């Protein structure tokens, strides 16, 4: 698998995810959201609420923008050049860097505007990254390459997290270094980190163009090859995946009593096991078939989340959480490689626009249903059961599809 890195294009592709993964890791997941709620916002509860609204608004904007590209994009341009995606890459860098200028006393709404624009830009940049797989893959290596890239993404997130940890460790008691708050440096750091590892891919693919989406051609492609069943399956298991990410820290804290430092260590450990999972599954996917790889991951997650619902042991929770991390990376990477193999080259843009739309829809629907269940039952544990239900539903169209493909 690692011999693939001998190719400059593949190295650049993997390093691209290594770079941009710092954005969801540091801005959306670990540090910046808490800094905004505690410091910039007028009140922590208000800040947490506004942060959630901003991310929801960004997801809706992404969905609308991708819908426009999918449905109407072809009316405006027949081919999409690299410059289109490069523009959004610059936007992501600019608005992420700009977070440096917001501290206590700043307008609490303006940094959220920067978050929304950078988030939408990140999603478009991520669309480019997924699309690029079909341009750089080699014969019979799609599964290995997709998982290798996903592993690099995990690794980039962990590496950027480690750098911020070191800055915090060597800062003073007020978390300042060179008279600047470490948390203010997170935005510029993510921007520079993304640029440092991201520009290489644009350089090696500067002559590449992508066919503008044609929704009618995509529908024909999907129907003729039975891919609609896979997309239905993807919709359900992606709701489960998004819900796991959204509620993992709450499950850890309120059911199993993990402290904040333990939750942080758990998140790092899950990402580390995600790297292992991608490397293990990726090393055999092209022999077993991408569909088989996805099937194994769904089954593994279904069993683990069912056990999680019933378990009360602190140590069992750790084992389950790490194994969930093992499967949660490959299920996404193998889904991507399946689409790349089964969708015609001229329909890749349309397919991955739809793929990203599903992702944004799931980021709202999955957590909403889990949250609604928790509210109706007044139990976080009952909320967990929604996740294996999603996974079970994803197996129904998947089993019908299995007889048609072995890729």
Regions found by a protein language model. Give the residues of each.
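A membrane-interface helix-boundary motif in multi-pass transporters
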Residues: 44-48, 167-192, 372-391
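Intracellular juxtamembrane helix-capping segments at the cytosolic ends
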Residues: 124-138, 330-344
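Helix-to-loop junctions at the C-terminal end of transmembrane segments
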Residues: 65-80, 277-289, 374
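Glycine-rich segments within core transmembrane alpha-helices of 12-TM secondary carriers
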Residues: 146-167, 356-366
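Multi-pass alpha-helical transporter architecture, strongest
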Residues: 10, 65-73, 193-204, 382-407
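Short amphipathic helix-loop junctions that connect adjacent transmembrane helices
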Residues: 25-48, 246-266
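Juxtamembrane intracellular "pre-TM" segments in multi-pass secondary transporters
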Residues: 2-10, 206-232
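Structural signature of the two symmetry-related core transmembrane helices
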Residues: 83-98, 292-307
